[in-house]
UniProtKB/Swiss-Prot annotation:
This is N-acetyl-gamma-glutamyl-phosphate reductase. The active site is at C147. Pathway: Amino-acid biosynthesis; L-arginine biosynthesis; N(2)-acetyl-L-ornithine from L-glutamate: step 3/4. It is found in: Cytoplasm.
Length: 335
């Protein structure tokens, strides 16, 4: 059994990690940490009678001593402090769910702050399994992609060589309120979010550069990207609509299915995607349609799972030589 730790366990992604790992035949929770001590069932009452385990004050060296792999479910800028100390201490591996290792140094410091660990940033692997599977298998540090980038890149990736790069892509993304995190904000307060839909940080959102950088790597050159996220009055789930101009006429369905032909968790839809079909699962559903030289790609994921915790476990599975699909949820909540 591989020994697993979670630092920053008190948030939504921490709970989802616990739920998946408890169903994992090859993983055992060995270390849970947050900013304060207590029983895990005090933080998440739904775990009472399911998991009797203490949450400790986060300590990087203690995590490294007791674990084969540590998930960092910490805020941006905080995760790199723990990652650096763990990686320097011993051979323990790290999957970081923050943005601290996702971007190039230049783009990170543009969007966040001065990076404290450029050495590890330079060899961190971007953890989008469908794209970087072989690199992830060999990695000690994996940067788990953001939810919006996951949903967007998986939609765009099959078509990067057919899109007119001079015109670029427009991404209209909609996410449930859980994407804003557990901390209370005015926009995610019930009276603000309920029965509402609003765009936020249009064009300037931090995830725009993450998407642009990764699709540029896939395309071999930069593709102009306009990204507009929206907060929707649902708890969880995410849908992305991508619009672009094609350089030539293509059979988009054939290209999509060929690109993802061996991917268990990519599903092809004949109609525009529905969030309800993916919430509670590791699946990404994709629909595509073309007309003349225009292309529309529509994708959906669970922002807390495929966009965060189940993707992190998929990365850990590869890093620890476990079956890639181990414990990854497949059945949507539905009703």
């Amino acid at each position: 059994m591989k020994k697993i730790g979670i630092i920053g366990v008190s948030g939504y992604t921490g709970l989802e990690l616990i739920k998946i790992i408890l169903n994992h035949s090859g993983f055992k929770l060995s270390y849970l940490a947050a900013t304060s001590e207590g029983e895990i069932s005090e933080i998440f009452p739904q775990l009472a009678g399911v998991l009797n385990m203490k949450v400790e004050i986060a300590d990087a060296k203690e995590a490294a001593k007791r674990c084969d792999l540590v998930f960092l479910a910490l805020p941006h800028e905080k995760a790199m402090e723990f990652a650096r100390e763990i990686l320097e201490f011993n051979s323990t591996k790290v999957v970081d769910l923050s943005a601290d290792y996702r971007l190039s140094l230049k783009l990170y410091e543009k969007n966040y702050t001065k990076h404290l660990d450029p050495k590890n940033l330079s060899h961190a692997v971007y953890g989008l399994v469908e794209i970087n599977r072989e690199k992830i298998k060999k990695a000690r540090l994996v940067a788990n992609p953001g939810c919006y980038p996951t949903c967007s890149i998986l939609a765009i990736a099959p078509f990067v060589n057919f899109i007119d790069k001079n015109i670029g892509v427009f991404i209209d993304a909609k996410s449930g309120v859980s994407g804003a995190g557990k901390g209370l904000k005015t926009t995610s307060h019930f009276v603000s979010a309920n029965e509402n839909l609003n765009a936020y940080s249009p064009i300037t959102h931090r995830h725009a550069d993450e998407i642009k950088e990764q699709i540029g790597i896939l395309a071999g050159s930069e593709i102009d990207t306009i990204f507009v996220p929206n907060l929707v009055s649902i708890t969880r789930g995410m849908s992305v609509s991508v619009f672009a101009v094609l350089k030539e006429k293509i059979d988009a369905d054939k290209i999509l299915k060929e690109f993802y032909k061996d991917e268990e968790f990519i599903r092809f839809r004949d109609e525009p995607v529905q969030i309800k079909n993916v919430v509670g699962t590791h699946f990404c559903d994709i629909f595509v349609r073309t007309a003349c030289n225009k292309i529309f790609i529509n994708s959906a994921i669970d922002n807390l799972l495929k966009g965060a915790s189940s993707q992190a476990v998929a990365n850990a599975n590869l890093m620890l030589d476990e079956p890639e699909n181990s414990a990854l949820p497949k059945i949507a909540y539905g009703i």
